[in-house]
Amino acid sequence: MAVLENLEPKKVFHFFEEISEVPRGTFNIKGISDYCTKFAKDRNLEVVQDEVGNVVIKKPGTTGYENSAPVILQGHMDMVCEKRPDSNHDFTKDPLELQIVDGNVVAKDTTLGGDNGIALAMAMALLDSCLLYTSPSPRDGATSR
C-alpha cells in the first residue's frame, strides 16, 4: 500500500511518492532527471534533457488556446540530504521512507526533500491532468475536461 495514497490532491501525492523513490541529492540528479524525462515521453510531451540533467517539458495548449502565452512551472530536482546520526540511510541509492506522523508527511530519519519535491509533483500532476480548459473560454460557461 502506498503511504500517501489517501492524501489529497491524489495525483500530487502519487507523484511525490514516486519522486521520493528516486535518490536525488545535490550532484546526484541523473536518476530524477531520467525519471522526469521518461514521465514526459510516456505522455508524448516534448522534452529536452541537457548534459547536466536539466529537464524542460512542454505541453501544447488545448483547443482554442494553442497561441496563448505559455505558463512556466519550475522546481529544482535535488534535495538537501541530512539524516539522524544513527541512520544507515545512503542518499546515493536508498529511497526515502515516507511516513505520516501526527498528520504530517515526514521521512524516517532523513530530510523529506519536500520543498521542491512537491513542486515537481505539482507540475507533473498538472502535466498529467485532463483538467485543462478547452474552447470556448471558461468565462463563457465552458466546463473543464
Each model region followed by its residue ranges:
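N-terminal low-complexity segments that are often proline-rich with Ser/Thr-Pro
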Residues: 142-145
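An acidic- and aromatic-residue-enriched active-site/binding cleft used to recognize and process polar
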Residues: 52, 110, 139
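Catalytic-loop motifs flanking and including active-site residues across diverse enzymes
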Residues: 115-122
